[in-house]
Amino acid sequence: MATTAESARPSPLERSWWLRAPAVLVAPRPVFVALRDESEHEVDRRQDALMTVIGLAGISGVLGTPVARTFLNDPSASVSIIPVWAFLGGAFYALAAYWVGGGLLFGAARRLGGLGSYRRARSLVALASAPLALSLFTLWPVRIAVYGVNLFRTGGDDWGPGDRTFGGLYYAAFGWSALLLVIGVRAVHGWSWGRSVATVGLASSLPVLLVLASRLH
């Protein structure tokens, strides 16, 4: 029984990734450099932590969509459904960012001469989403506490300077994530700032165009 209990505990290496992942917010370069180790053993060690980060970021992302702001406009919608909807929608967003976003980053890096793997590109995207994951525990609780259910329907008291401030902080989290992605590309490839920015810009061009197109309709 003791042996079974010990084997169920996270090893020091596994625990280190649960500490490394949040550390990307304050000391990103060493965390990203650790992604250079792509041995199967090391990839397995960090997988759970990275998927947790991008999963939380996905929930934060879905809460900021126009759909969320009008969710309760439907009379049949219930407040109790919002957490379930946010979780499922966040999971979808996280998977899309991880697989599609990772693929776009991988393709952009290869285009500019990178030799890294698709798996490492996905890990970069996951780690870079840490600011959005952080906003789920900092920005969103305060925003929901201030505006309550009015945040999820139109015509409430959630419009005005205060809401624009929260919106600005939310978009700042996206900007922070983009900056971390540039730092991550530079760290794992050993590239210049210009080449790293170009890689992230090329990878994000298609998603940006799609978002702009959806806004114009």
Regions found by a protein language model. Name each.
Residues 1-60:
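N-terminal juxtamembrane cytosolic/stromal segments of multi-pass membrane proteins
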Residues 50-64, 96, 100, 177:
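Hydrophobic alpha-helical transmembrane segments of multi-pass integral membrane proteins
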Residues 18, 88-96, 165-175:
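Hydrophobic alpha-helical transmembrane segments of multi-pass membrane proteins
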Residues 70-74, 101-115:
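Membrane-helix interface/capping segments
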Residues 68-85, 148-159, 217:
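Membrane-interface interhelical loops and short amphipathic "cap" helices
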Residues 58-73, 211-214:
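Juxtamembrane "helix exit" motif at the C-terminal ends of alpha-helical transmembrane segments
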Residues 50-52, 87-92, 99, 122-125, ...:
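Hydrophobic alpha-helical transmembrane segments
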Residues 105-106, 114-216:
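Hydrophobic alpha-helical transmembrane segments and adjacent short intramembrane/lumenal linkers
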